[in-house]
Amino acid sequence: MTAPKLHPGAEFLRNVFGSSTEHPVFVCSLLNAEARGTEPVNERPLATRNLGYISRFAEKWDRPGRGLYFCVATVVPGARRRAKETLSELNCLHIDIDFKNVAASPEEARRALAQCPCPPSCTNNSGHGLHCFWLFAEALQATSENIAEVERLLGLLADYLGGDRAAAEVSRLLRLPGSHNSKDGCWVEVVTESNGPLVRYELDALCKWLEAVSAPLIARRPPEKGNGQDSNPWLEVAARYKFKPPIDVEQRLAA
């Protein structure tokens, strides 16, 4: 009897997590920002290593008004939510490049990535940008020390390659290949772009590379000014009193 064909997202997760980790992979479906309130439940989570479960979950929840995501780190067994305190294994460095936020064209960005001394292990086209991954030869336990070191490197990587700084954290959700980006009425498939053989890196090699770079290889566009004012007085007051507004998770998710 022929085994059912796996969803592309399940195949991707097997390649990324299969040989270097042991604990559950976190996958979820989230309502798009513009679709909030149209369904009673926003987040539909799944934490498992069963590829069949992931395939069926992806087929069920890949639909307009929602997005399918996976966490870049594994979670502890039994976890029902994704947060730094529920992470188990750190498996990669990653970057979220939004084409509208960088000065390079999509093809220029791809060429720059390919020319890096340590090119990405794999790259996904998110529909409006690139999600790139530098896989570790061996996963790291998600201790506070390892989290701090990996997030330091994620910050260097984002600065060097024009990535979103908000995505430079170890519990990040990124779009699942084989699903569709349906924001603002679009229906664009998230696809894995071939980078050749899957390369895994020692953390020391990535550290030496990122600590040696200077000027950005992919520059970000300067932020646009809103109404002609140089600053937002409300944000200035918030900064003065060290007030932090609640994080809008969907707004921060990758394009």
What are these regions (language model features)?
Residues 75, 178, 254-255:
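Short, hydrophobic/amphipathic alpha-helical patches that form generic packing surfaces
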Residues 155-187, 206-220:
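Flexible helix-coil linker/hinge segments at domain or subdomain boundaries
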